[in-house]
């Protein structure tokens, strides 16, 4: 469909002001539901109670005599690990609270949605096959006319770059939705700089961007539901899914996949319950409101030398915090299936 299109769409710049990490802007009021407070009480209060009780019993197990330094060191490490195990348990218990029913209604006049895949030398056969599968599914949904694929490449090696362009030509011939491709000559800021460059140059073209990793795969029904929830909730800045691991071939990889499939949904419900609208962002398999991201998530360059200074590497949770600081809801919805990532 898009084989004869130019490599990139017309420029639609969006200003992305660098944020201060030292001085917060005036924060609009945010509402935390009673359900979230209750989940936090169960998760953190329960872990505190269980961990304290376990540590007290460990101390009593030392006997009535004078404890030694080694015993106190043992107690400290026992408490640290036991509190962690206790929190894992109580956080899952919080997930048994009833899930909030989220609004979902597609806006017939809604803006465009970019499926953004940053790449850096990955196998183009794998990445483009995943994008083609998603494009073919999306073409059968109500959001087909709104969706475009945008590959933002930071690939530096010439052979890998040529491989990307060859695979791109095939993808554009076969894809039922538009496919755009941009490669930076220098990967300034790495992945966060790659995404920032996209937002600054074409952010004004899109209402939302679905962030994908090179090994991400998402079902069209899930993408449609995510867009519908964003359309229905104008204060929702970021919606994260719980990706399911796929593609493992070794025995260990298969075991990890099985474990994730077995108790991952329970963990996801617990995390979603106690985080509420103060959620996290894992950098992929999520949908983001572009203008909210642009106005809130311009990352500064930290003062000092690496690794303390320089560009922020673990940028995703910082971006989630900046969105929430600006008053946007950041949420993970564990009921959204059909989201996958390679192991």
PLM ranges: what are they?
Residues 1-107:
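N-terminal membrane-anchoring/stem segments of glycan-assembly enzymes
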Residues 2-3, 87-343:
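Internal catalytic domains of large membrane-associated glycosyltransferases
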């Amino acid at each position: 469909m898009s084989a004869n299109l130019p490599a990139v769409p017309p420029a639609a710049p969006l200003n992305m002001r660098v944020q201060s990490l030292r001085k917060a802007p005036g924060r609009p009021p945010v509402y935390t539901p009673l359900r979230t407070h209750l989940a936090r009480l169960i998760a953190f209060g329960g872990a505190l109670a269980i961990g304290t009780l376990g540590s007290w019993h460990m101390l009593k197990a030392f006997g009535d005599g004078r404890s030694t330094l080694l015993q106190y060191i043992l107690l400290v490490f026992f408490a640290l690990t036991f509190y962690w195990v206790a929190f894992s348990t109580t956080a899952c218990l919080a997930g048994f609270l009833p899930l909030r029913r989220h609004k979902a209604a597609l806006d017939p006049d809604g803006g465009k949605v970019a499926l953004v895949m940053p790449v850096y030398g990955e196998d183009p056969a794998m990445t483009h096959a995943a994008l083609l599968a998603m494009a073919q599914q999306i073409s059968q949904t109500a959001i087909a006319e709104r969706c475009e694929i945008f590959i933002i490449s930071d690939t530096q090696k010439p052979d890998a770059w040529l491989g990307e362009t060859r695979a791109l030509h095939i993808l554009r011939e076969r894809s039922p939705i538009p496919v755009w491709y941009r490669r930076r000559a220098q990967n300034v800021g790495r992945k966060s700089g790659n995404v920032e460059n996209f937002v600054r140059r074409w952010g004004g073209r899109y209402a939302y961007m679905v962030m994908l990793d090179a090994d991400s795969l998402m079902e069209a029904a899930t993408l449609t539901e995510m867009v519908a929830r964003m359309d229905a909730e104008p204060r929702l800045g970021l919606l994260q899914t719980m990706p399911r691991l796929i593609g493992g071939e070794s025995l260990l990889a298969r075991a990890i996949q099985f474990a994730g499939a077995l108790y991952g949904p329970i963990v996801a419900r617990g995390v979603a319950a106690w985080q509420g609208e103060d959620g996290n962002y894992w950098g992929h398999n999520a949908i983001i409101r572009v203008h909210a991201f642009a106005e809130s998530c311009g990352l500064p360059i930290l003062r000092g030398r690496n690794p303390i200074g320089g560009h922020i590497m673990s940028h995703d949770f910082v971006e989630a915090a900046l969105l929430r600081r600006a008053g946007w809801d950041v949420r993970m919805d564990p009921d959204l299936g059909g989201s996958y990532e390679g192991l």
